[in-house]
Regions:
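Positively charged n-region of N-terminal signal peptides that target proteins for export
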Residues: 1-4
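Hydrophobic h-region of N-terminal signal peptides that target proteins for export
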Residues: 11-18
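Cleaved targeting-peptide boundary
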Residues: 20-25
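N-terminal targeting signals for Sec/Tat export/insertion, comprising classic cleavable signal peptides
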Residues: 26-50
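Short beta-strand motif characteristic of blades in beta-propeller domains
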Residues: 31-38, 79-85, 135-142, 189-197
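Trp- and S/T/G-rich repeat-edge/linker motifs of beta-rich repeat architectures
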Residues: 49-64, 99-120, 157-174
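Structural signature of eukaryotic scaffold interfaces centered on beta-propeller domains
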Residues: 183-184
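Conserved small/polar residues in nucleotide/adenosyl-binding loops
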Residues: 201-208
């Protein structure tokens, strides 16, 4: 009986660990889901008949931080944006039912916007927010208030970019999220909020 209890406990621990490393994302095609390795950034398309394909190979092969990578759904049903929440790097990830030639991961921003150390244990440092322009997201460094406009495209992969909106740090030496974004009534503006001081900053929207 004791052996059975120990075996069951080990199984529960293993499943919990798996759930923390791997995250499943539903898609608007009910036959397919995406499985993300949140440590490495590997993305697999999982079909309900048991078939699977690697859409995006590991971006951080030696990654050991759970929840470092995440996926953001776009208004295009076949496209997600993958974000490295430690560095701000991001990729356009596309799944498909037409075959592997239509599955890919294309880099949008390949440059590190922050430089974690081996001991860094950041949580949701970089975050993305959808805008009313379906092709555009706002990328926020929630530790210091820096902002970028991120654009994806399903027609022209040369039209992917990540450009700064606000390069200036509005806070420093923070090891947790203190900035957040809230939309204004105007579709062209938003509030950047310092949750520690309650200061509000307004900014124009991303370009059309």
């Amino acid at each position: 009986m004791k052996k059975l209890i120990v075996s069951f406990a080990l199984m529960v621990i293993t499943l919990a660990s798996y759930a923390q490393v791997y995250k499943m994302y539903s898609t608007r095609n009910y036959h397919n889901q995406l499985r993300l390795n949140t440590m490495t950034g590997e993305v697999q398309q999982i079909q309900d008949d048991g078939q699977s394909w690697i859409i995006c190979s590991a971006r951080e092969i030696s990654g050991d931080k759970e929840s470092r990578f995440c996926l953001y759904e776009t208004q295009n049903m076949w496209t997600f944006i993958m974000l490295d929440t430690y560095t701000g790097k991001n990729w356009q990830v596309q799944f498909s039912v037409k075959g592997e030639d239509y599955m890919f991961a294309a880099p949008i921003n390949i440059f590190s916007l922050a430089y974690p150390e081996a001991t860094s244990n950041w949580t949701n440092r970089f975050q993305m927010f959808a805008t009313q322009n379906m092709w555009t997201f706002i990328l926020l460094d929630s530790y210091n208030g820096r902002l970028w406009q991120v654009q994806y495209s399903t027609q022209d992969l040369d039209n992917l970019f990540c450009i700064p909106i606000n390069k200036d740090e509005l806070g420093s030496d923070n090891e947790k999220c203190i900035f957040s974004i809230q939309p204004l009534t105007s579709m062209y503006q938003y509030y950047l909020i310092n949750d520690r001081t309650c200061l509000l900053y307004t900014s124009p929207s991303p370009r059309d």
